[in-house]
Amino acid sequence: MSSRSRSTFLAISFFVLIDWVSKLAVLLYRGNLPDARPILYQYSWGKLIFCICPTFNEGAAFGIFSKYKYFLFAIRIAIILGILAFLFLRKKRTSPSIRFSLILLCSGAIGNVGDILFYRHVVDFISIGFKRWYFPTFNFADIFISLGTFIFVYKLYFPTKQKIK
């Protein structure tokens, strides 16, 4: 295994581990509470609100397409396999930022697919809000997917200029 492949594998493993350990910690903590209350932790900073409140999502982003579980699962697996094939089988060097964005995308997808395999749904637990408005609950895998997508799209639309030698 080349050093590039090894570092890619380790990076994906690291991000997936962050996602799975955080979800497991939240679920174990929730299971130890006598009343299984929905909010495990809440912190307010002025008008900003941060909550740890586990919820379960059977669809895609924000629960959409929850009626198409098997189709979504197949799409997720195809995306993971496509990204892994690109990362590990491509001989030509890829820019580090594109490579990192694909590592984040793949890690997030693997994290959520792991949830589906182990729990039959995706475990979301991070909730943020401002005054009375709350963003839909999410997890670290969702953060990785969003950040990876942002970096990927940014690098496609605003590529760095290469000096011609």
Curated annotation (Swiss-Prot):
GO cellular component terms, semicolon-separated: plasma membrane
Compartment annotation: Cell inner membrane
Keyword Cell membrane: yes
UniProt pathway: Protein modification; lipoprotein biosynthesis (signal peptide cleavage)
Positions annotated as active site in the UniProt record: D124, D142
UniProt cross-references to Pfam families, sorted A to Z: Peptidase_A8
Catalytic activity: Release of signal peptides from bacterial membrane prolipoproteins. Hydrolyzes -Xaa-Yaa-Zaa-|-(S,diacylglyceryl)Cys-, in which Xaa is hydrophobic (preferably Leu), and Yaa (Ala or Ser) and Zaa (Gly or Ala) have small, neutral side chains
Membrane topology: Multi-pass membrane protein
Name used for this protein in its record: Lipoprotein signal peptidase
